[in-house]
Amino acid sequence: IEAAKSSNNCAVPPFVGDLPIAENKEVLSIWKDYKSGEDCSNQRRETQQVIDDLPDEVRAMVFGRLPSFLNGASTDVKKMFRAIMYNRTLNYDLKKQELSKLAEEILSKKQLAEF
């Protein structure tokens, strides 16, 4: 959203498809009546509020930061989690399911407790 503020392009954010279903619908609703060329500061502010209200782990998944439970993980383990997190063909619910499955298979007990 910050990058969008520095440009004159106003539109539904490109990450909207990566959001959980409820937040996806909320952001689409925010932008539904927007007309190209109009001021979009209200839409940007409301969208930012939706993002700010996301739990940390969801925000990390949507915007690409690795969650803290992976801080001590090997490079290979981090790569496996990144492959799921950055997979644009999976929606949020499928990513969550795949990440949970992977976590059960490869994380240590300590990491799994933090997961």
Curated annotation (Swiss-Prot):
Organism: Onchocerca volvulus
Annotated phenotype, changing residue 59 to Q: In strain: Isolate Guatemala
Highest taxon of source: Eukaryota
Protein name per the record: OV39 antigen
Additional comment: Antibodies against this antigen can recognize a human retinal pigment epithelium antigen explaining in part the retinal damage caused in onchocerciasis.
